[in-house]
Amino acid sequence: DTAGMVAGMVASGVTAKGLNGIEAEANKLAKPKLGDVGDGGDAVLNDADGPVVKEGSIEQLSEIEYKELTGYEYLDTQLGNLKDKVKLNQYQSAESVNDWWANNGYDRPPYTPKTVVQDITLDCDTIFVRVYDGNISGLRGGWVMCAEDIKGLTPEQIQQKFALPSTPKYIGEVKLKAGSNIRMGEVNPNYGFNGGGIQFDLKGQYIGEFKEIGSLVDWSMGK
């Protein structure tokens, strides 16, 4: 469970700050870092040197001083409104998840290297959105995002933020039921776009109820 996970990390010299309000009295962890390997072979956070999660990469949090978001606070902030509505299963390295997708036919790593991907289970029915162009991409698919992360953005800004292969024209609603197991993390630069948004992947599962909303511009810009 989360408490056990945090306790284990604290025992190895890691400051766990942000998970369920737990604050361990140890040396302050500047940001999430990857190094130690957990029981299941997945990465956990430690004080190892190396590249880390980038400051300021969550664009929708522009009013927050990123220098104040450290360690587990950063990961909690990624969850946003979902923070108290999910169960955290694992922290995984972006590299391990990218390898998983490569083994399933993806030739472009979807998650930013040297960042943390969170494996979560939804505690309640949850509504996400999905954008698409109707040609290269469609209403149904395995990648979704939170509505608040794209509301007010132009299609071009959304394409840049989520490194999409084509400019989206439409938006759909995606309802995932309680108990759904998904992953979330930072979008890797792809197709010449910067990425940096927070995406959710359905882990190749055929789950969710998809419903058309309509024009992305009308929905996002309030037309």
Question: Where on the chain are the PLM-derived regions?
Answer:
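Glycine-rich short-loop/terminal segments
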Residues: 39-155
